[in-house]
A protein has these predicted regions:
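Bacterial N-terminal signal peptides that target proteins for export
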Residues: 2-10
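Primary mode marks residue(s) on the alpha4-beta5-alpha5 output face of response regulator receiver
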Residues: 25-180
Length: 180
């Protein structure tokens, strides 16, 4: 299990460069905690560590998961809970660094999200070409062996799991578990 200091260090790296004042001014710690916990399954809610975007601990947990409220720059909801592998993934994605998973990683977004391109990890809005998807409650999985993803569809409208961001270092499996 990752120790708390290393977890906070990774989280600090993950959050570098984000503006926090807007979200902090609009949301109380209780609201941010509730938002972050809405991403977690019921069996983990009392076990996860929850951090706000200023790295303040809103809840200290003893599991391998760290949850965050919706990022301040996003409209709508998009809280997520990440294990250690996903924390590394998020750091790489946010800092546009190469990434190769060392282990299987699982991330929860059980409150859903407000949308992302299925093909471009850095798209900021919907276009006709970028397969914009507003996903309901879902899990995300990364794997060290990307060839395992070849058996899965890339079409987000196939009615089941699909591969997002194929042919990028940030490729992962999306597993919808509820209505969009």
């Amino acid at each position: 299990m990752m120790n708390t200091k290393l977890n906070i260090l990774l989280t600090s790296t993950l959050l570098a460069g984000l503006s926090c004042n807007l979200y902090a001014a609009e949301s109380s710690p209780k609201e941010m905690l509730e938002d972050a916990l809405s991403a977690a399954p019921p069996t983990l809610k009392d076990k996860v560590t929850v951090l706000d975007w200023e790295k303040n601990v809103l809840q200290k947990g003893d599991s391998r998961y760290t949850c965050f409220p919706t990022p301040p720059q996003l409209e709508g909801k998009a809280p997520m809970c990440m294990d250690e592998a996903w924390m590394e993934w998020a750091d790489a994605w946010m800092n546009k660094k190469p990434f190769q998973a060392k282990t299987i990683g699982i991330s929860y977004m059980l409150a859903g999200d407000q949308g992302a391109s299925n093909i471009d990890p850095y798209a900021e809005g919907e276009t006709e070409e970028n397969q914009w998807v507003k996903e309901g409650p879902h899990l995300m999985i990364i794997t060290p062996d990307q060839s395992l993803l070849d058996s899965l569809p890339v079409d987000p409208n196939n009615g089941g799991p699909y591969v997002m961001w194929k042919d990028t270092p940030y490729v992962h499996i999306m597993i919808p578990v509820g209505e969009r």
